[in-house]
Amino acid sequence: GIDIPANDDSRGARAVAIRAQVSKTGEELGRPLRLLIGKPGLDGHSNGAEQIAVKGRDVGFEIVYEGIRLTPEQIAKAALEEGVHLIGLSVLSGSHLEMVEDVFARLDQVGLKGLPVVIGGIIPESDAILLKERGIAAVYTPKDIDMNGIMVDILNLIRKANDLKPVEAA
């Protein structure tokens, strides 16, 4: 099953406020906000990706969860076919630098250069800096436990990519 952190607030005031902002942003963009959550590579540990998918759904994002052991080609194809606004990758195998490079190359090939991509995993600070330099919009690690805060971050990354002003933290 999927473990939800003890500090989860999926039905509290903060989550309700985030849900309203997700809905408002969808209206501004003319369609509901969609996130693709994927686990590229051979890593089979899916708890973090599933927690993000569940929390995203709880605050109003449409979630496309493609599962584990995906190729970068499968991720890019799904992003194109599903019309997602942002991709969230979960990489715990240590291959995050190589995987991101390949995912970006595949996104470019299908015409999705510039689509925001975030990544989560056990990522050293030095690698997080490199990932951001290479175009990753945000890096999350196990110490990032504020799920509502992550959802606001994701919402604002989508807003920024679509030339909308950021929302205030809920």
What feature does the model see in each segment?
Residues 1-170:
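Domain-level signal for soluble alpha/beta catalytic cores
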